[in-house]
């Protein structure tokens, strides 16, 4: 077996195995929140998968998943002045009402939904005109912060095309190494270092 074939097999071995289950959970969460905020049960509208899974750099055994739920802009006035925790709590209750046996709780910036094999961190957000998002931080009385995941995902996708998909491959291999050796390094840092390495 050539070195190329060994790397190909390595990437097959670390590929996410439970995509269908992950997508099912994302859909369930989205439907619960669409029902609460929009009286709709769409499993796909108004969410954005972020984190390593959203950037396509996750590997087999991924245990923490991240998503944004885009709250209708009509709700902004209700929460803008000190309503950060209230928005997170409403998000939690909507999921808890729909799935009462699942552990769901507010954790400062997100609502954590704990499933048997992985957990999902759900962040309710308001979309801004520049395609960024405003999200609640419930710490110390509450504040609003901004994030630009669409720009990050677009930059990753563009760079992946320029580098013949090697960026995502390198990110996945680095994650496997990190997991194997217990290195304390976050996924975004891995992706950033891999991006910078291939860029330079």
Task: Please annotate each region the language model reported.
Residues 1-62, 73-82:
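N-terminal regions immediately upstream of nucleotidyltransferase
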Residues 19, 23, 27-30, 100, ...:
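Catalytic cores of NTP-dependent nucleotidyl/adenyl transfer enzymes across multiple folds
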Residues 28-40, 90-98, 173, 177:
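Generic non-transmembrane alpha-helical segments
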Residues 40-44, 97-106:
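Short secondary-structure junctions
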Residues 51-54, 69-73, 115-117, 124-126:
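Short, flexible loop/turn elements at secondary-structure junctions
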Residues 61-65, 116-118:
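A short, glycine/Asx- and small/polar-enriched loop/turn
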Residues 68-94:
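A broadly used, surface-exposed interaction patch
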């Amino acid at each position: 077996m050539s070195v190329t074939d060994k790397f190909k097999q390595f990437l097959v071995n670390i590929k996410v195995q439970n995509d269908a289950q992950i997508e099912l959970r994302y859909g369930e969460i989205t439907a619960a929140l669409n029902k609460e905020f929009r009286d709709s049960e769409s499993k796909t509208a108004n969410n954005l998968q972020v984190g390593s899974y959203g950037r396509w750099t996750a590997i087999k055994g991924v245990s923490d998943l991240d998503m944004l739920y885009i709250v209708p802009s009509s709700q902004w006035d209700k929460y803008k002045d000190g309503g950060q925790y209230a928005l997170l709590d409403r998000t939690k209750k909507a999921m808890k009402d729909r799935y009462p046996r699942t552990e769901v709780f507010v954790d400062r910036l997100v609502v954590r939904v704990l499933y048997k094999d992985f957990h999902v961190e759900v962040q309710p957000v308001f979309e801004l005109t520049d395609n960024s998002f405003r999200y609640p931080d419930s710490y110390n009385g509450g504040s609003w912060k901004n994030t630009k995941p669409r720009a990050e995902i677009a930059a990753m996708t563009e760079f992946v095309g320029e580098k013949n998909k090697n960026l995502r491959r390198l990110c996945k291999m680095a994650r496997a190494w990190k997991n194997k050796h217990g290195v304390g390094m976050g996924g975004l840092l891995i992706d950033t270092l891999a991006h910078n390495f291939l860029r330079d």
